[in-house]
Amino acid sequence: MSSKATQDPEAVLAEQSDDATEAGLRRQWQELADEVRDHQFRYYVRDAPIITDAEFDAMLRRLEALEEAHPELRTPDSPTQLVGGAGFATDFTAAEHLERMLSLDNVFTPDELAAWAARIRTEIGADAQYLCELKIDGVALSLVYRDGRLERGATRGDGRTGEDVTLNARTIEDVPEKLTGTEEFPLPSVLEVRGEVFFRIADFEDLNAGLVAEGKPPFANPRNSAAGSLRQKNPAVTARRRLRMICHGLGHIEDAAGFPFRTLHDAYRALQAWGLPVSPHTAQVTGLDAVTERIAYWGEHRHDVEHEIDGVVVKVDEVALQRRLGATSRAPRWAVAYKYPPEEAQTKLLDIRVNVGRTGRVTPFAYMEPVKIAGSTVGLATLHNGSEVKRKGVLIGDTVVIRKAGDVIPEVLGPVVDLRDGSEREFVMPTHCPECGTELAPAKEGDADIRCPNSRTCPAQLRERVFHVAGRGAFDIEGLGYEAAIALLQARVITDEGDLFTLTADDLLRTDLFTTKAGELSANGKRLLTNLGKAKAQPLWRVLVALSIRHVGPTAARALATEFGSLDAIVAASEEELAAVEGVGPTIAAAVTDWFTVDWHRTIVDKWRAAGVRMADERDASIERTLDGLSIVVTGSLTGYSRDEAKEAIIARGGKAAGSVSKKTAYVVAGDSPGSKYDKAIELGVPVLDEDGFRRLLENGPDTPDS
């Protein structure tokens, strides 16, 4: 799709007789530029053009002619100034929600549901009318429409601020670019709508089948793959993933009549009339008994739905009652999610095989007849180690019971002994590495795990380490996936992960993966080199994670990076100094110290340093040290912070993120399900903050938070 020809500017001017004011010209240019960009998006990202190339060329020529006649209209991001699909990339900038995007409280038993309904009845003095809808196991998305046109799509984030994923949202089939009002439901000037993005089970299975056919590892489950697909930097990848969306709520509305709906059910009718997707399985019911019937029904028919569900959401339907009931800092009081228990199924254990991980750990896994469970097909499950296999008492050939804990992770519970026919056989852990032949042994006496000690050259450990370097929790290098790791090692382009940051175009041309049929470097190869260059500036904690030091994940790495500030300082620290860091302890400290005693480990660090990888963090002077000297304990789940993020925020402001409550504790921050630390704080009289109080404490220090 390209055009360089121009039209006679006089012809353009002749068409502007009724629209020649400056504002009119700007409006005309904006409408035409938007239309061109829309068709470019359909062509380059969605691969689904709706006009011919000739029609597009004519449209682009009209825009070029308009800009030539009125150069002041031309902007740097005009379609005439960009090549092809340039500009269609998602950079995940912060996007503030117009209205807070709350979470939901969960209940897991009929008694807990009844207690919630009783609180509602006590508050309103009667049985409420409820709206029951399926709880889709997907990822939340907020859309903003202004004057009927899609303006922005954003993830939930911390409820106040999410990530801008507008380009990716536009690729979802169910997300309309433009809404159409009706006589019954006129469009508000601004509409913020919330929904769930998901994979239909059939689409998820097709996606995984395609990945397996390409020699790539399949996704674990539909929810995680939906979240990953929505967060792709290249929206064209998202477009190929066949994501779907269902709307289940409203945020901010700007309308002459205020919030124009009496019930949530009416709001859903309006959304559907405007062209937005809503669930066909929503039901209005009155009283707890009717709610319980809906929950029981969908518990039995959950696999009759095209997508995965993990419960039923129950909402008070009348908007006036919703406002009366209000919300906590994290969830509305007028809604609750009834979560179904994890599912179990029986299947045949065909074999037990082993996998060698990046730190040499040899893990047995169950290879089973595929079985449907929790809406997806399961054929593999971990067995952790040889001792666990013996403890569970499973034999190869057994019929076994498997469960998806939390409807996500497959787990072998044990055998159905009564179904044994004598053909079953015991699994024996290998004595030598299946990849390199080295004799296996525990890292130390008493360990349940056995490991391959050939950490430097074992092919399995090498490719897992190279792949790990690129992971989201490490350097986060797009383009360096499992297939790329194998290709680079097999072509001997790299000997280990230490060579990654000195890769050149000539190096990549030695692999088929990054070479075109014409013998040139592929687009993926160029992208990999660019992303490797960017990764050199990643913060220190990511470098630590990428080194594959045993026990050092993002939590410990952040703690060490925050405490010491540079890799040299970490190497120079004693084991006791490392262990004293909050969140580290003696086991991790010993692992870090031991790792740096190995010559080839230090060589990897030296190679990265020589290639320009950042080995020290610059302290952010813009963050005020509002918590200097304060010991703060975080307990329970926070909506806006992961546990690591909360600790990082405390440490960055000069505080200590303590793991236990004592008389020296300045504050305890209590989220959802806080546990014994909350009780200890009450017993000792330590001030307790909710999440809003914690946020004020971070911003202003100890003088202003309210518990």
From Swiss-Prot:
Uppermost EC category: ligase
Keyword Manganese annotated: yes
CDD domains the record matches: BRCT_DNA_ligase_like, LIGANc
Main function: DNA ligase that catalyzes the formation of phosphodiester linkages between 5'-phosphoryl and 3'-hydroxyl groups in double-stranded DNA using NAD as a coenzyme and as the energy source for the reaction. It is essential for DNA replication and repair of damaged DNA.
One Gene Ontology term, aspect cellular component: cytosol
Catalytic activity as recorded in UniProt: NAD(+) + (deoxyribonucleotide)n-3'-hydroxyl + 5'-phospho-(deoxyribonucleotide)m = (deoxyribonucleotide)n+m + AMP + beta-nicotinamide D-nucleotide
Keywords: DNA damage, DNA repair, DNA replication, Ligase, Magnesium, Manganese, Metal-binding, NAD, Zinc
Location of region: Disordered: 1-23
Taxonomic superkingdom: Bacteria
Family matches, as SUPFAM superfamilies: BRCT domain, DNA ligase/mRNA capping enzyme, catalytic domain, Nucleic acid-binding proteins, RuvA domain 2-like
SMART domains per record: BRCT, LIGANc
E.C. numbers: 6.5.1.2
Name the record gives this protein: DNA ligase
Ligand binding (Zn(2+)): 433, 436, 452, 458
NCBIfam families tied to this protein: dnlj, PRK07956.1
Residues where NAD(+) binds: 53-57, 103-104, 133, 156, 196, 315, 339
Family: Belongs to the NAD-dependent DNA ligase family. LigA subfamily.
GO BP annotation list: DNA repair; DNA replication
Start and end residues of each BRCT domain: 622-707
InterPro entries in the cross-refs: BRCT_dom, BRCT_dom_sf, DisA/LigA_HHH, DNA_ligase, DNA_ligase_AS, DNA_ligase_CS, DNAligase_adenylation, DNAligase_N
Active site: 135 (n6-amp-lysine intermediate)
Keyword Transmembrane: no
Cofactor(s) needed by this chain: Mg(2+); Mn(2+)
GO MF annotation: an example: metal ion binding
